[in-house]
Design a protein with these regions (language model features):
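The catalytic Nudix box helix
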Residues: 39-73
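A generic structural signal for short beta-strands and their flanking turns/coil linkers
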Residues: 33-35, 40, 70-72, 76, ...
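Short, well-ordered beta-strand micro-motif
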Residues: 14, 25, 97-99, 122-125
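A generic structural micro-feature
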Residues: 4-5, 33-36, 86-92, 113-118
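Residues that scaffold the ATP/ADP-binding catalytic core of kinase and kinase-like folds
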Residues: 24, 47, 132
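Nudix hydrolase/Nudix homology domain
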Residues: 31-35, 102-151
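Active-site-adjacent beta-strand/loop module that shapes the phosphate/pyrophosphate-binding cleft
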Residues: 78-109, 122, 144
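N-terminal strand-loop-strand
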Residues: 1-38
Length: 151
């Protein structure tokens, strides 16, 4: 079996004033039936810290520009292995929490890979997230959020 490609990533738990979290609907370009929901974020650029990467990804994927310091420290970290576009990855990722009043998501800064694998976004309530049968990541997302904020 092939060794996984090591990848560092940063993600943002973006929660609005209605206590909803923003998730993007993605799919594997090599298998479009492999669908999932995930938080804004992605791989770090060379030399980039997790907080810098989280702020950059947040702007690229939502149009929301913030200073990295606005994100504070990571609230969660995990390591996941997954296959995407026929490649096996081992991804270490830091999650940051950002609460905002509201936001009209702007995806015009998506890169080519995001345009090829993300087709929509949605603001989810915790009840909707807990009730859905659709896969989302991290799988502990509702528990994680409830442990961080009162929803």
């Amino acid at each position: 079996m092939a060794q996984p490609i090591a990848r560092l990533a940063a993600r943002v738990l973006l929660i609005d004033e209605a206590e909803r979290i923003l998730l993007f609907h993605g799919f594997d370009p090599a298998d479009p039936t492999d669908e999932f929901w995930l938080t804004p974020g992605g791989g770090l650029d060379p030399g980039e810290s997790p907080v810098q990467g989280a702020a950059r990804e947040l702007f690229e994927e939502t149009g929301l520009r913030i200073a990295p310091a606005d994100l504070g420290e990571p609230v969660f970290r995990n390591v996941v292995e997954f296959t995407f576009n026929t490649r096996l990855y081992r991804q270490e990722q830091d999650f940051f929490l950002l609460r905002i009043p509201s936001w009209d998501v702007d995806t015009t800064n998506f890169d080519e890979g995001e345009r090829a694998s993300v087709d929509r976004y949605r603001w989810w309530t915790m009840a909707e997230l807990e009730a859905t049968a659709e896969p989302y990541y991290p799988e502990s997302l509702p528990t994680l959020i409830r442990g961080l904020v009162e929803v």
